[in-house]
């Protein structure tokens, strides 16, 4: 087998991965004989007691803040002691006082329908505040993990609240790095990861999905750094979720902190990943809607890794080799687009003052979903490799506006140079007292040069700051 384990960190990332696994659940029932997917790549199957059916659970570990899983109990569906219907008040033995420490979260109408074996209602943003409100698969007993001291805030789901006191937020890269290293690493490696690896025969790699704007980026950076040491000989795809900066403005100090978080998390993840995908999300979209759109890319990339019959591609490292195009240092996928929209945060970055003309494309490929053929005009694009995979099967949880998808274009372009050069200047001008300032400048300068096509003079580089 060619198993892929997915690890997510943050409420936004869990919305995305819920949409992805809902699609995997649908694929179990609608497999295409000619270009079908192998469910064992992303799902662990066990034979039921009757010996005639199989049950599947995602090969995944999900991290969230305390209470971030909503109405889903950690051992719900595994132990009745962990389940309480929201219509029933807590029961206690005589003489025992029940203390409620957080507001009770009721199951969504969608989940109540699934649990009752009924047809679920259509989803709306209001009915999908938590990723567990519309999850169609049951996760393993150790797959859903929560931070011990940082509580989920419905009003600010990307900024967990320390002990729910309203005084400290999980909004700094350093916070996340420290929390994983000191509080979460041991249980993750000894319990959650160990269980996932035990269920794999031939692990091909990991998908690591997180936000970059807040403490979760540091959390995933620490996790990936240690994971790469623990499991070194597999492929790593990093997925960084970035909220569009053109959305609601933040106070100057908060805006700078978000940029600092984004810079550090992106550098940490891309240096530990074989391919890094900087995903852009509209600030106006709900997490449910943003997850539905981002699933276009996540599902398309991973669909190429689980084909039962493929003449072109079967493994993560094969896609990485195609996009590296001979230079493993160029591992940022800055082109991600379909006929509907661009999904890349890097693609919308402002041009650096030294940039010349349109950015050069080093490599690109098109993932065709099913039998749909692209227009002839796009087939003439130079160096465009076509990779055909199975048809896009959107789950009923994908927003209606995001259910059409024929292809996804991926590419490594010179646009990365703009990002790294702009970040270089930001570090040089604003990171005056950071102890790692010179190290960051060196790393950004090296990365910027790796994505240059042609000759740039020293005056063009902007590296004299």
UniProtKB/Swiss-Prot annotation:
Q: Which InterPro entries match?
A: DML1/Misato, DML1/Misato_tubulin, Misato_II_tubulin-like, Tubulin/FtsZ_GTPase_sf
Q: Which Gene3D superfamilies match?
A: Tubulin/FtsZ, GTPase domain
Arranged from A to Z, the UniProt key words for this protein are: Mitochondrion
According to the UniProt record, one GO cellular component term is:
mitochondrion
Organism, scientific name: Eremothecium gossypii (strain ATCC 10895 / CBS 109.51 / FGSC 9923 / NRRL Y-1056)
The biological processes this protein is annotated with in GO are:
mitochondrial genome maintenance; mitochondrion organization; plasmid maintenance
Its biological purpose is as follows: Involved in the partitioning of the mitochondrial organelle and mitochondrial DNA (mtDNA) inheritance.
Q: What is the protein name stated in its UniProt record?
A: Protein DML1
**Where does the record say this protein resides?**
Mitochondrion
Q: What is its main location?
A: mitochondrion
Stored Pfam families: Misat_Tub_SegII (PF10644), Tubulin_3 (PF14881)
Question: Which protein family is named in the record?
Answer: Belongs to the misato family.
